[in-house]
Swiss-Prot record:
Residue intervals passing through the bilayer: none
One MF term in the entry's GO annotations: translation elongation factor activity
Natural source organism: Buchnera aphidicola subsp. Cinara cedri (strain Cc)
The name this protein goes by in its record: Elongation factor Ts
Highest taxon of the lineage: Bacteria
Subcellular location: Cytoplasm
Lineage start: Bacteria, Pseudomonadati, Pseudomonadota, Gammaproteobacteria, Enterobacterales
């Protein structure tokens, strides 16, 4: 039977599917909108199931912030083109807001809740979409920073003296920007797991022994290199990117504030910040 453009348009509005897909569905359903929708759902689910194993290396980071809660979510796709799609952005915002509003942070649970919507989305864009990572943070002061949708940072902290709100906000925003750029793994030396420090110590011992120096000098070399290692991976010991002459610790002290915790997500990054 001949399918009118008006009917195809109506089905497209209802399902978000392409023109030719809607036309084919209506032809298969003899022009019945309800049957056409069901047909698209069946075909779309089949297409989606074939695509879910494809790798997703592009995507965006989404954030949710309330007075004392922050959530970061990584939603990934196969291509950069889809990750810039408005529907992709809306889907990511919907998920992260749901997580924050309902205080659900378990990735498996979030995937189960949004699975049917994700499958429908995959069938429309014809490529795999993954709800890849989710992190959350709590605290009295929450500040966030997003860099081009590819890196997201949220920090929690506290005032050590009655600073003005404007100064505090600016201070924490600067630190969030620093975390985005410098990618610290831990807040302080106390947060570094013993096995990480031990592994680095063993590596530096092996390197130092090759110098043929005396035991006393070797100990000094190892100690110096470990100190450098710690300063590179801990937030408060890093040189402040905005003013490299001081450390983050110096900046915090100067502004009479402190960082309790932070989370950072970057699209496609496999190294987890163990601060969560």
């Amino acid at each position: 039977m001949k399918i009118s453009v008006k009917l195809i348009k109506e089905l497209r509005i209802k399902t978000g599917s392409g023109y030719l897909e809607c036309k084919r569905a209506l032809q298969k359903s003899n022009g019945n909108i309800i049957n056409a929708i069901n047909y698209l759902r069946i075909v779309g689910t089949d297409i989606a199931q074939r695509k879910v194993l494809r790798k997703t290396k592009f995507g965006r980071i989404f954030s949710y912030c309330s007075k004392n809660l922050g959530v970061l979510l990584e939603l990934t796709s196969e291509t950069d083109f889809v990750s810039k799609n408005e529907e992709f952005k809306n889907f990511g915002e919907k998920i992260v807001n749901f997580s924050g509003n309902n205080k659900i942070f378990d990735l498996t649970e979030i995937n189960e809740i949004f699975n049917s919507k994700k499958i429908n989305f995959i069938s429309r864009v014809r490529e795999n979409i993954e709800i890849n990572k989710i992190k959350y943070i709590t605290g009295n002061i929450i500040e966030s920073y997003q860099h081009l949708g590819k890196i997201g940072v949220i920090i929690s902290g506290k005032m050590l003296s009655p600073n003005t709100h404007l100064n505090t906000t600016k201070c924490f925003k600067n630190i969030a920007m620093h975390v985005a750029a410098a990618a610290p793994l831990y807040l302080s030396e106390l947060d570094i797991p013993n096995n990480v420090l031990q592994k680095e110590t063993d590596i530096q011992k092996s390197i130092a022994k090759k110098t043929g120096k005396s035991s006393k000098i070797l100990q000094a070399i190892i100690k110096g290199r470990l100190k450098k290692f710690i300063s590179e991976i801990t937030l408060i010991n890093q040189n402040f990117i905005i003013n490299p002459k001081i450390t983050i610790h110096d900046y915090l002290k100067e502004n009479q504030v402190w960082i309790n915790n932070f989370i950072r997500l970057q699209v496609g990054e496999n190294i987890d910040n163990l601060n969560t």
